[in-house]
Structure formats: structure tokens, C-alpha cells
Amino acid sequence: MKKYFFPLAIVACTALLNTSCSSSSTEPPVPQEYEGDLPKPTYSEQAVSFEIASDNVKDKSGKASLKAINFTESGKAIFEVKTTAGTKFVTYGATIDGDIYIVTDANGREIGRLRKLTSRAADDVTIEGTITVTINGVEYTFTISTKATSTSVPPTAVSRNTNNLARTWQVASMNVVLSGDIDLSKLVVGGNLKEFADAAQEAGANLNAEEMKALSKVVNSMTFNKNGLLSIEYSDASSDGCNWLWASGEKQEYIRLLQRNGAEFGNKFLSDRSVVKVDFTPTSVALTMKTDIRGSKNYSATLTVVLK
């Protein structure tokens, strides 16, 4: 069945900290409240999600199933794949031409395309095509010919803040303040999480090997869509996926982060109970979150990520 997803029904979100870092300790500029409309992304009218209820779309090995494809407002294709290691996400570039969806890698090379077929009688959507995606160095080739639930959100059906947030953002900076048993204030430029992890470790955070590994990535971008999905895209071509939800009332100042289909997300400084403050400017958005850390050291972490 094809359905239209409206603001009250938007689903929920995960994994956000995976953002940026650099060196100065100068406080970042605080965005002023902005209540205007940001320019519409290229595919704000054509963005769509295809969800596959069954596990019948498997890769050639039979070990992975394609569960969903989200074609976003900014021209991204976010794939949700069920593997033997759990639910994984990977993000590519996309071009939408009517009912044809072309997927490209970081070099602009086509890695597959889909065609959408709609039955007037039953209002069913069928997607067909062949696509090869790579997750953690493993290639999965899916030959697709299946019914799917098609979900689209017309820009007129959602709030201004949802339209403003739903796009791909580049990480500009991250400012972190640790207070309590650990005292640290660090502004980082770009998406290198390791800079932040190293600074926290030097300040006595006692991060273990697993926690340091989770903070070893470089974030290139973040993609929000109007269906409530967030993708965090790393420099190694991997992605994390989660759902997002407005946590406040009509003013929509906060989003809540929640897990999506059992996919792992977050790290030492982010939990699935995180609530994120959202502040827009005419050219950027600042996301601010606070996490209480309890363990061998007890402290609070306040993180402000600026996306442009």
C-alpha cells in the first residue's frame, strides 16, 4: 500500500554524536533564533521511502536482506540491510527522474537503479532493479522485484522546522564541555571524533579500547529526512542510521533520538535517552545535547554540533 506520512506520525531517531572535532577551546558562536524558510533541497517534492515487509529480497549469498531504501530530499539513497551481524545502514548519492531512481557511489559511478511500478487497482507499489552496496568492506548485490510500502511526505504536510531540517548537512564544528570529575572544553573543526576522544582521555576520562574505537571515525555529513530517519555518513563510506522525533510541542525546539530496528548506535557520550536542542540560522543548524556519564569517573558532557 502507498501511504503519505504526516508530521504527527513521524518516527524516531538514533546515533548522533558521531560528529566532528579540532583544536581551539574558543566558544563557538551561538546561533540566533531563526524562523524563516531555508532553501528547498533538490528533491524536496520527490523524496520517498520504500519499506519491504518480508525478507524475500536477499543478496546473492542469501545471508543479507534488503529492508528499506530511503531516497532523500538532498539526493541521497539510504539502504537499510539486515545482515548476520544485525541491521546496518549505508548511504549513497541518488538521482530521481520520475519513477526511475539512479544510485551512485562517491565517485559518481552508477552502482544500480530502481524503477517504481504502481498498480491503479490495488494501489500497490512494486520496485524493480539491481543494486550492489558495500557494508564494512563486504559487497551485497540485490536483484529486486518486490512489493513495497511507499511513504512520501509532501512539504506542505509538515512544519517549517521539519522542512528546514530534512536535508544533508556537512559537519562544520563540534564543541564539547565536560564538567564534574573531568573538566574539559574543546572546539573541534571538521568531523574527526578521535581529536575529541584523545582530549577527553588526556583529561582523565578513562575511555576503554571499545569506547576509543567507537570514537575513532571521521564524520563527513548527516542526512535527515521527513520520514524521521537520520543517517550519519563517515569518511570510510560507512553509515549509522536511526530515527528522529520532535520531542517538544508546536515550537519544535528539541528532537529525541531513538533506536531503529535494533541497529546499534551511540557511544560513551550519547544514549537512546538523548534529547537534542535544535537552533537554526539562515545557513546552518546547531544541535546541542547533554549526557550524564556514570562510572569510574562521574561527569556531564555537553556537545554542540554545528552543521552547514
Residue ranges of predicted features:
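Acidic/polar, low-complexity intrinsically disordered N-terminal segments immediately downstream
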Residues: 4, 22-176, 308
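Short, solvent-exposed loop/hinge segments that bridge or flank secondary-structure elements
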Residues: 49-74, 171-227, 257, 261
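C-terminal motif of bacterial Sec signal peptides marking the signal peptidase cleavage site
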Residues: 17-20
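Contiguous, well-ordered beta-strand patches that form the walls/edges
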Residues: 72-126, 206-293, 299
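Short, low-complexity, Pro/Ser/Thr/Gly-rich segments in the mature regions of secreted, periplasmic
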Residues: 299-308
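Bacterial N-terminal signal peptides that target proteins for export
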Residues: 1-8
